[in-house]
Swiss-Prot record:
Residues 48-142 bind DNA. The keyword Membrane does not apply. Probable transcription factor. Mediates lens formation in the embryo by promoting the proliferation of the specified lens ectoderm and suppressing its terminal differentiation. First expressed at the end of gastrulation (stage 13) in the anterior ectodermal placode. During intermediate neural plate stages (stages 14-16), expression expands to the presumptive nasal ectoderm (PNE) and the presumptive lens ectoderm (PLE). By stages 18-21, expression begins to deplete in the PNE, while intensifying in the PLE so that by late neural stages (stages 22), expression is restricted to the PLE. Throughout tailbud stages (stage 23-31), expression is maintained in the lens placode and lens vesicle. Residues 1-13 have a biased composition (Basic and acidic residues). Coiled coil: none annotated. This is Forkhead box protein E4. It comes from Xenopus laevis. Pfam families: Forkhead (PF00250). One of its GO terms (biological process) is cell differentiation. It is found in: Nucleus. Keywords: DNA-binding, Nucleus, Transcription, Transcription regulation.
């Protein structure tokens, strides 16, 4: 059996027998008793402010006159206000950068062309102004998540060219940042998005008239209709159905007379007069080839764009084809109206029946 002296030597070799030695190690006595030998992983450093990095960034932006700062300006404010961060700047500066990019409450604003310098500006999202309890930077209510990425006009990181120009939101009246958003110029920079080539602004009086959009469906259709060679209507096989004796006449011609295609219900005897009226109006030798359509199709009404009087068709079924269609049109126009028996009536509307084609005419497809 070991003597008491030998036990005391073993205990001293471990270095954790007396409370005095515990105090010499840097930990108080009550800490060792309360934790039961469990040490704190990251002890609190002396002199470190009790604010999180998000609170430090928000504090720096709030104390800025323009409510926006560059990354260097945020570093400067933190080091001037808290002497603790004047040492070991590399560690906490990395944490500041990570918090700026990973938290939705901070918004990046590109630098304006007339203000040379390095780095973009950072500001606080107006919807995140109340994320601290009672204006105190010590406690945050919850993690802020942005619902609208176009908070500021200059923030065009994920926006598209087809979206309307965003406008800045008003700041909250009862907030610690009462003037956030007042020092920003609502300007879209062309260098941030290649498709943004113009800037559209409107005054408060023009807000009720609707906002002009750079790219809209109407403007794209109008530009496409101007590229067409003729402003006339399209005479397609949807509106004229031919039987087997007439042959395969599926090519459509551009006809200058628009009045003869504005009716939706026609009679078999009126088809001949319609063809006679359009015999002198053939003004284009460009043909469009169409795929085979269903056997029963109603006569489509004429459709016009809102801002243009030209008649336009669907762009997905247009395909340029060489060769004039005057010969086929002359053969069609030379027939009387009684021989065209493909017109049928259904619910007071006319539709054309596409019959089988004669042999030997497949080369015109």
């Amino acid at each position: 059996m070991d003597s008491p002296d030998s036990v005391r030597v073993k205990c001293e070799s471990k270095g954790s027998c007396s409370p005095e030695e515990g105090l010499n190690n840097g930990l108080p006595e009550e800490h060792n008793q309360a934790s039961g030998g469990r040490r704190r992983k990251r002890p609190v450093q002396r002199g470190k402010p009790p604010y999180s990095y998000i609170a430090l960034i928000a504090m720096a932006i709030a104390n800025s006159p323009e409510r926006k700062l560059t990354l260097g300006g945020i570093y400067k404010f933190i080091m001037e206000r808290f002497p603790f961060y004047r040492e070991n700047s590399k560690k906490w500066q990395n944490s500041i950068r990570h918090n700026l990019t990973l938290n939705d409450c901070f918004v990046k604003i590109p630098r304006e062309p007339g203000h040379p310098g390095k780095g973009n500006y950072w500001t606080l999202d107006p919807a995140a102004e109340d994320m601290f309890d009672n204006g105190s930077f010590l406690r945050r209510r919850k993690r802020f998540k942005r619902t609208d990425i176009t908070t500021y006009p200059g923030y065009m990181q994920n926006s598209s060219a087809f979206t309307p120009t965003p406008t800045g939101r008003a700041s909250y009246p009862n907030s610690i940042y009462s003037s956030v958003g007042s020092g920003y110029n609502p300007q879209i920079h062309q260098t941030h998005h290649p498709a943004v080539v113009h800037q559209y602004y409107q005054s408060p009086g023009e807000a009720g008239q609707g906002q002009h959009r750079m790219f809209s469906i109407d403007s794209l259709i109008n530009q496409q209709s101007l590229m067409q060679p003729s402003p006339g209507a399209e005479l397609t096989h949807h509106s004229l159905g031919l039987n087997g004796n007439l042959g395969n006449m599926t090519n459509s011609c551009s006809v200058g007379d628009l009045s003869c295609f504005q009716t939706q219900s026609i009679s078999p005897t009126g088809v001949g007069s319609l063809l006679n009226r359009s015999s002198n109006a053939v003004s284009s030798n460009l043909t469009y080839s169409y795929s085979s359509s269903p056997p029963h199709l109603p006569v489509p009404p004429a459709s016009y764009s809102p801002n243009n009087s030209q008649l336009y068709g669907s762009t997905s079924r247009l395909a340029m084809r060489s060769g004039p269609c005057v010969d086929h049109t002359d053969q069609l126009l030379s027939l009387p109206g009684t021989q065209i028996n493909g017109v049928c009536q259904y619910n007071n509307s006319s539709y054309m029946r596409q019959t089988h084609f004669a042999s030997g005419l497949e080369r015109y497809m």
